[in-house]
Structures are given as structure tokens and as C-alpha cells.
Amino acid sequence: PLLISQLVRIACLQMALQPVWEGLKDERWSPQQLAVIENQLAKIDLLKGYRISLLGERDFANLMIDQMGDNPKSAGMLLENDGTIPGYWLIPQGWIYHLQRRLNEMHVKFSQRIVDPKARRIRPDIAVTFATEVQARSSRSFPIFDVLSSMLLPAIEKVAIKIGSSQTAVDHTRTACLLELHKLEHNKYPAQLTDLKTPFP
């Protein structure tokens, strides 16, 4: 799984949540239907999905870099060299390893820390620092050791923020279903969320 799969997942969720809210507004859902919807929403963990897809991005990048080391022509293709520029096959192995180290350094220091699935937190401060560092690396006059970082890392912080807002939308919808279930059972909304039978998100 890659980040693009999470973006597609978010797009599908946005379309799926709209009719749920319309049904809640018009009080069309039965208790059984609400229970099914709430149960399905409870299984959705976009923060965990982000982390899994980010590890996939990192593993995919490392695979490409390994292929660059094994086959110099792969490096030429990745760097958009169609072979008309001589000497791309002379790229030293040490340079490739340094590219790999710099790329993984960005993942370990920043992108993998933007989202904390266990604490259920998004860290915008780390996302901003990450974006600033990517920009600084790519804007150097001769970013020879950050070529891959510039190509493979941009926009990760935006995806993390989007995933956070989408998970919030899922949690809000689930909470609304629990509130409606309580209302159907007791003919009124609970005085506080802790009165719900199922712990709210």
C-alpha cells in the first residue's frame, strides 16, 4: 500500500459519509441500521493506514535505490536520463548509498513522526518542519545528495493533515450514530457523551 491508496480511500469515505449524515438529519435510519453503520465506522483507522502506507513508500523507495546500485541504467531512468547524457553509468555506489541515507533520514526524523496512531494525534509542527526541510534541501544550488528526497518526499505532510481531518470526520459520524441510537432507545439525547453505552471515539 502506498499513500495514493489512502487518498483514494479518503475520497471513497467522503462520498460514503454524505448519505449517512443525510439519513441522520432526516431521521431515516433504524436502530439496526445505525448499529451496523457505527460498527463499520469503528473499524476505520486512517492514522494506522497512513503509517502503513508511509512504510510502503519508504520500502518502495529503498527497493528503487537498491536497483539503482545493481543496475546503473535504472539510475539513468530514475533521473530522467534517456542515455543521451554520457557518464550516468559512472555514478559511484557511495553516492547512491548517501542518497538512500538522506531519504531514510527524512522519514525517520519527520514523516514517520507526523502521525502518532497510538496517541491518536497529528503533529502539524513536525509537518511544517518537514516541509521546510524538504524545501531547503531541494532549493540548494547543487542538491546532489538530496535528489531523491526532492522527488519522493514532497506533499507527504499535506497527506498527513488530510488524513487527520478525514479521521475526524469518521469519528464525528460514528459519534452521531451513537447519539441517535441513544435517542431512539431513551427518547432523548444523553446529558453527556460518557452516558453512551459504547465509548465514543
Locate predicted features:
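Short acidic linear motifs
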Residues: P1-P201
